[in-house]
Amino acid sequence: MADDDYNEVDDLGYEDEPAEPEIEEGVEEDADIKENDDVNVDPLETEDKVETEPVQRPRKTSKFMTKYERARILGTRALQISMNAPVMVELEGETDPLEIAMKELRQRKIPFTIRRYLPDMSYEEWGVDELIVEDSWKRQVGGD
């Protein structure tokens, strides 16, 4: 009964479409190059430049680690330690991964880099060992 509703409407015309002609890629490009030989074109600079050596520029951001950076670093490092990552400090009976991460931060042994983005979408990278950290007892750790 449902087939009766579609008497001659079954053909939607998909098979009757002509095949697209194959385009030779080199032919049109060569013609464009010959027409524009006298135009000087500089290569476009992309935002994702790969620098071989980090350039030491004067830093714009604070040398103090924020409480948000501290929380993220301690949490990330504690997760790594809980998944059997090598510990960078001597243990004195500590078993809690968060306590071990705090000890590593106090001794400036965490091998992380913090990337701080600026409003113009550029960024500064700081090593954890470069930043001044205030731990939860308001005792300053590190810095110059």
UniProtKB/Swiss-Prot annotation:
Keyword Transcription attached: yes
Annotated GO MF terms: DNA binding; DNA-directed RNA polymerase activity
TM region positions: none
Ranges annotated as biased composition (Basic and acidic residues): 46-56
GO cellular component, one term: RNA polymerase V complex
Gene Ontology biological process: DNA-templated transcription
SMART domains with a match to the protein in the record: RNA_pol_Rpb6 (SM01409)
Gene3D superfamilies: 3.90.940.10
Alphabetized UniProt keyword annotations: DNA-directed RNA polymerase, Nucleus, Transcription
Localisation: Nucleus
Biased amino acid composition, Acidic residues: 1-32
Region of interest called Disordered, as start-end residue ranges on this chain: 1-62
Biological function: DNA-dependent RNA polymerase catalyzes the transcription of DNA into RNA using the four ribonucleoside triphosphates as substrates. Component of RNA polymerase II which synthesizes mRNA precursors and many functional non-coding RNAs. Pol II is the central component of the basal RNA polymerase II transcription machinery. It is composed of mobile elements that move relative to each other. Component of RNA polymerase V which mediates RNA-directed DNA methylation-dependent (RdDM) transcriptional gene silencing (TGS) of endogenous repeated sequences, including transposable elements.
Protein family according to the UniProt entry: Belongs to the archaeal Rpo6/eukaryotic RPB6 RNA polymerase subunit family.
Quaternary structure note: Component of the RNA polymerase II and V complexes.
NCBIfam families according to UniProt: PRK01099.1-3
PANTHER family: DNA-DIRECTED RNA POLYMERASE SUBUNIT K, DNA-DIRECTED RNA POLYMERASES II AND V SUBUNIT 6B
Name assigned to this protein: DNA-directed RNA polymerases II and V subunit 6B
